[in-house]
Regions:
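Cleavable N-terminal export/targeting peptides
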Residues: 1-38
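Subset of outer-membrane beta-barrel
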Residues: 27-327
Length: 327
């Protein structure tokens, strides 16, 4: 039936949806040729997302598992974190993680789930199929272990990850692996590298390589630079900055303001989202902004809140909110 055939086409479109939405250079002819494009999204780390998706040398605790597994080695306490991510065209996701120090090592487990609500399905003539129950489900779960060496100057982590991509007509399941390293030089400079999604079937899970560094000029300002290379896209250099008022200054907690940039195409102007217009971001793409609050004293536990907003021109905006608790 032509309707069923068109569902197949729509499923393929869903598989490429994120690749189209994620910024890409026009000259990159391989963009979208690898699956599980949702693995490019820094779900679970609004901090890294706010700094232009640059966090390979900075990520710590549960947020590190989706960026650089070595980062969980810095955890001194047990930590639970939850994040809610909103992407384009009703695409959204949730993230949950838990890290636990054991002796000289730290283990962590996380779960990420993504889906599309109200997916627009039409037949070959373009007529809406309101009764069609088309679901697009993406997700992953991983188990990580990391350890610090030389008084926490060198952090090494590895994780095994099961990735699911269900595009209605086709379902892919892949076991992949991540490896990461963070090297801290003195108190101000840190370097990081992470390779993600290795050993998956060819082209079914996009592979990611991150290489970057961060420099803390003082307790108030940190600058990060990072080169990200995907198996279906050329590498790009991005950067981000974080301004913080330490807890020692405010007495009640640390407040951070963040901004970052990664090169992106001109995605046009958004005429529908009034919030972007009021902020002067309706024709901005590539930039991201965020805030963070953290207190080591709240109710006797460590508590953190992070929020990020990333405009993408005519496509709309992405946002992410995360909470974490340390005990």
């Amino acid at each position: 039936m032509k309707t069923k055939n068109f569902f197949t086409v729509m499923a393929a479109a869903a598989a490429l949806f994120l690749s189209a939405a994620l910024p890409s250079a026009a000259s990159d002819t391989k963009v979208g040729t690898d699956g599980a494009a949702f693995m490019k999204i820094p779900t679970g780390s609004p901090r890294a997302q706010a700094m232009g998706n640059n966090g390979v040398s900075l990520a710590e605790g549960g947020e590190a598992m989706g960026i650089n597994p070595a980062g969980i080695a810095s955890a001194q306490m047990r930590e639970v974190s939850y994040a809610n991510m909103s992407w384009f065209q009703e695409y959204s996701g949730q993230y949950l993680s838990y890290v636990h120090p054991i002796g000289q090592s730290v283990v962590g487990i996380n779960l990420g789930y993504y889906g599309i609500d109200g997916f627009d399905v039409r037949d070959s003539e373009g007529k809406p199929q309101y009764g069609a129950d088309v679901k697009v489900r993406n997700g992953y779960t991983s188990l990580a272990i990391a350890k610090g060496f030389f008084l926490e100057k060198l952090l090494i982590g590895v994780s095994a990850k099961q990735v699911l991509e269900d595009n209605y007509t086709t379902e892919y399941k892949n076991l992949v692996f991540d490896l990461g390293v963070i090297l801290r030089i003195g108190r101000k400079l840190s370097l990081g590298w992470a390779g993600q999604n290795f050993s998956g079937k060819k082209h079914q899970v996009v592979k990611v390589n991150r290489l970057g560094g961060a420099y803390a000029f003082n307790p108030f300002m940190t600058l990060a630079l990072e080169q990200k290379t995907y198996s279906d896209r050329k590498g790009r250099l991005g950067g981000g900055v974080e301004f913080s008022l330490p807890e020692e200054v405010l007495q009640v907690g640390r407040v951070s303001v963040r901004a970052g940039y990664s090169p992106a195409d001109n995605l046009g102007k958004n005429l529908d989202d009034k919030s972007l217009g009021s902020l002067g971001l309706s024709d901005i793409s590539g930039w991201s902004f965020g805030v963070g609050l953290y207190s080591a004293q709240a109710l006797g536990y460590g508590m953190g809140f992070d929020y990020t907003l990333a405009p993408y021109g005519s496509l709309g905006k992405a946002s992410q909110l995360a909470l974490r608790f340390q005990f």
